[in-house]
UniProtKB/Swiss-Prot annotation:
Top-level taxon of the source organism: Eukaryota
Functional summary from the UniProt entry: Component of the 26S proteasome, a multiprotein complex involved in the ATP-dependent degradation of ubiquitinated proteins. This complex plays a key role in the maintenance of protein homeostasis by removing misfolded or damaged proteins, which could impair cellular functions, and by removing proteins whose functions are no longer required. Therefore, the proteasome participates in numerous cellular processes, including cell cycle progression, apoptosis, or DNA damage repair. Binds to the intracellular domain of tumor necrosis factor type 1 receptor. The binding domain of TRAP1 and TRAP2 resides outside the death domain of TNFR1.
Molecular function GO terms recorded: enzyme regulator activity
Native organism: Bos taurus
InterPro entries the UniProt entry points to: 26S_Psome_Rpn1, ARM-like, ARM-type_fold, Proteasome/cyclosome_rpt, RPN1_C, RPN1_N
Modified residues (N6-acetyllysine): 551
Spans of repeat PC: 409-442, 443-479, 480-514, 517-551, 560-589, 692-723, 742-757
Pfam families per the UniProt record, alphabetical: PC_rep (PF01851), RPN1_C (PF18051), RPN1_RPN2_N (PF17781)
Protein name, UniProt field: 26S proteasome non-ATPase regulatory subunit 2
Amino acid sequence: MEEGGRDKAPLQPQQPPATSPGSGDEKPSGKERRDAGDKDKEQELSEEDKQLQDELEMLVERLGEKDTSLYRPALEELRRQIRSSTTSMTSVPKPLKFLRPHYGKLKEIYENMAPGENKRFAADIISVLAMTMSGERECLKYRLVGSQEELASWGHEYVRHLAGEVAKEWQELDDAEKTQREPLLTLVKEIVPYNMAHNAEHEACDLLMEIEQVDMLEKDIDENAYAKVCLYLTSCVNYVPEPENSALLRCALGVFRKFSRFPEALRLALMLNDMELVEDIFTSCKDVVVQKQMAFMLGRHGVFLELSEDVEEYEDLTEIMSNVQLNSNFLALARELDIMEPKVPDDIYKTHLENNRFGGSGSQVDSARMNLASSFVNGFVNAAFGQDKLLTDDGNKWLYKNKDHGMLSAAASLGMILLWDVDGGLTQIDKYLYSSEDYIKSGALLACGIVNSGVRNECDPALALLSDYVLHNSNTMRLGSIFGLGLAYAGSNREDVLTLLLPVMGDSKSSMEVAGVTALACGMIAVGSCNGDVTSTILQTIMEKSETELKDTYARWLPLGLGLNHLGKGEAIEAILAALEVVSEPFRSFANTLVDVCAYAGSGNVLKVQQLLHICSEHFDSKEKEEDKDKKEKKDKDKKEAPADMGAHQGVAVLGIALIAMGEEIGAEMALRTFGHLLRYGEPTLRRAVPLALALISVSNPRLNILDTLSKFSHDADPEVSYNSIFAMGMVGSGTNNARLAAMLRQLAQYHAKDPNNLFMVRLAQGLTHLGKGTLTLCPYHSDRQLMSQVAVAGLLTVLVSFLDVRNIILGKSHYVLYGLVAAMQPRMLVTFDEELRPLPVSVRVGQAVDVVGQAGKPKTITGFQTHTTPVLLAHGERAELATEEFLPVTPILEGFVILRKNPNYDL
């Protein structure tokens, strides 16, 4: 019997008929029309349909008669008819179609029935019928007064319809009306398990999100569905406002813990940025192998937990979290890929490819400037490889080819080459600490900090070496040591380091630059922790400075330090914004905007982006009016204003849009379009910031449309736009060895051969493109682009905010700020270990990641894959999965360091 109700004639003769004329319709006005229609319809109906229609009409009439003993069998028959027809998915089931015109009559009959079982039974049937009528949630109304028999018997479509009505009804009830919500809740408790059991997990989640009862999920979830449910919940996070987004994450986290999926739970705890929870998850896991995997994840995210000594395998876990092995694992990858051979800058510039051989004439324009560029390029390209051809053999020769501040950056680049190699690196840097030149000494101090970036060491070598120079008489020495400490302890929130640095800001000998760098360093160390001491000290420093001092370009680093301290903290910044109200313009709006955008970094908060767009547009009108008055006067005024005005807050607003939107794909796409408009119509300060924003939204992800835009603006009439565009090209392609970008940059190098500043930028971009010979990334997102590393964002922001005044900072004397990028450098590799942490080469498939949220079954998660043997490199947007069933990964996301276990069910 369970058939029929297909598009054409149903198989069983009895099926629900269209109405006969005169079947008490609610609206008599439409009745005549319908009668005519029915006449036509009756002609078309097949025998079986006709029979079905008559039968249903008879049943309805029977319900209208006085004889109550006939009600029960009539209702039974109606129900059987409706149920037996719900098998078809493509069309409205015939019985429902034929009963529609009787809907009003059935309701009347229901009202006149005596209370009791029959009345409830009738309510059930009307409830199902209501699904086809667009009424005022009558499906729900009659369901609640019906016989409460199980939902499943009426089919999936009915359950879906009901769920929609429950959600709407819930939103109309106030919190006060608790009693009315009770029956709805009981319904929900039926709907959710039904959906879970029928592959409609996301519908269950949607319903619970609508009625804000997500916590109910945990009870109804089973082994098969939890992965899908959690994937759906976490992918909804970007689209719901505070505080619901954290509620969703906490719910998914609870589900993972229920099934002892610790690595997944840990990842969500890191997304929530809740350190107590992280520690709780880590310590509650009793499986040492899983703990090691979680330690790798924490190390990658830059989180260090103080474990008690009695934890099993304490030393191993501490070592993994401290990233002690990062350098040796990275070098193992380099040997595997056969790229250990050091490169010199000329290998990158490929000067031999330039046709008119003006490598000579170009480099004579500003030889110190070119040598400085080569120092950076050499550092970027050989980063973390531990050897190069300029500095590690006989560095002095190279250092003295640089002048003054150039020596500082050149010496510091040694730190980049020895990145993460604390034991071996410091001995090589040591000899420069005794140099007679302050600049070289300061650079060596910075190098010590860089080497320790992202790596913990119980001996704290960076603190020991650098602490003596923090209040040194020479401001040059202060710069190197303070910025070095900032990089070495970024994200650690170490009180001892902060107490050492904070007094420097108020010290009378500190120049504005030193005060700025100190604020920066403190912001990096306390990143995202809302550290009270850091906040109060920086605020106090800002208050104490005079208006002219705040016009100094280095003053921009003070609010940046504040912003980094509150990175991603959302509303926690209200008090600071209030405190900044007393500062004079233009510094106030600059600081306010900067702190504000940092607080929402990576959140994808649409409302914030709208506010920032207002900031970008508001300024424009007022200037336009002036322009009409007197263009000439405006030009002169602009020239005078430019250095004093801090590139105002508009530049920051543009960067902020990128900073907020980079967290999720759709927001980033929309931001891209906006940037296009800003580049065409914006003020000069705005246009200078747009290339930097493009760089931030697509770090280490060389998308052609972005590269083309940047390439176009690298020839802009405004030199600062072109400097920033060229550098942005380097950021977008950082660590990718992208051939198309490399070719673009070589052409630019020829085009700008006579312009030392632009050429300097081209060289930097070339160095970044080949960062770590193509093995490193600057992208702050990891774990399938779910987690944002705050330390990495801090490093990127430091550099980009400094580029807002590229002429005075980067092309001036403070190019050492570029080493902020070190905080974001991470190997983009996948290395697999066995349970004893020995390298274990296995074959993996690497391909473009596919979004599988809310899809049924087990869809493929990657497309267009190639099979490699680990260790392998993963490009932006790629995902890996094991190509063998012999091993099972301990964590579902294959990225960074992954521990594999033997599959017990694997038979050889």
